[in-house]
Amino acid sequence: MIIVTGGAGFIGSNIVKALNDKGITDILVVDNLKDGTKFVNLVDLNIADYMDKEDFLIQIMSGEELGDIEAIFHEGACSSTTEWDGKYMMDNNYQYSKELLHYCLERGIPFLYASSAATYGGRTSDFIESREYEKPLNVYGYSKFLFDEYVRQILPEANSQIVGFRYFNVYGPREGHKGSMASVAFHLNTQLNNGESPKLFEGSENFKRDFVYVGDVAAVNLWFLESGKSGIFNLGTGRAESFQAVADATLAYHKKGSIEYIPFPDKLKGRYQAFTQADLTNLRNAGYDKPFKTVAEGVTEYMAWLNRDA
């Protein structure tokens, strides 16, 4: 059995889909369906069982055996970069992850987990998986950074696989439940379909991020499980493309609309990553050599998925 925490969420459900595509259905999805809208991410997928996050954590903390576990993909977390409840964030993203990690280490279970490019904070170059480059801007980024630091202490002594992925700006199918935290491509598509002008912040041609398609993210996760490699790796494309490029690809698909530029909100000033670009040196050195979709390729594929019933 493979366990996917956050399996009804964005990246988790895409990992479940990637496993299904390989014929793997003996999957336990762990999630919190308090937001009932997330169930739609699982409707077309095949899993063996579902467990609530709190029930799962109780079993993990009590050391209960959950059966023959091949691996745990730990995608479950609070991923809101605007959430400032530090206790909630640390409980969800740090303590929970530590409990799961030790459960896996004691049983020799591969543990593959979601870290984040938010660990790098506001830097504009050298996004390298090393302490001197890490300075998160928000408590979400700090919770991810602190767990990476915890893992670094354990990695040299670990007898089973531990791998963390620093996700950059992931976009693609199954993110609709994320609301304001969904990708720019998702929001632009919604605005166009509602007959509105798609909106970007002023200066969006200068805001550049490493936008990575979620299908590529899932593929990297599965490759690492098969390879058995351990470590903490950036997971982006290695390219920085502008929000304007995302909008251009969205408009090109829809063949209509023009961008309305809106003022940059004061509340985000100083807490906003204006530039991200994954350094893929470690990922490539680990042996992952497949290409990543460009914004034009990924957004076009995503638009086709979003508008498949239109």
From Swiss-Prot:
NADP(+) binds at residues 10-11, 31-32, 38, 53, 75-79, 92, 144, 170, 178. This is ADP-L-glycero-D-manno-heptose-6-epimerase. The gene is hldD. One of its GO terms (biological process) is carbohydrate metabolic process. Contains a large N-terminal NADP-binding domain, and a smaller C-terminal substrate-binding domain. The lineage of its organism: Bacteria, Pseudomonadati, Pseudomonadota, Gammaproteobacteria, Enterobacterales. It catalyses: ADP-D-glycero-beta-D-manno-heptose = ADP-L-glycero-beta-D-manno-heptose. Homopentamer. Gene3D superfamilies: NAD(P)-binding Rossmann-like Domain (3.40.50.720), UDP-galactose 4-epimerase, domain 1 (3.90.25.10). Its cofactor is NADP(+). Keywords: Carbohydrate metabolism, Isomerase, NADP.
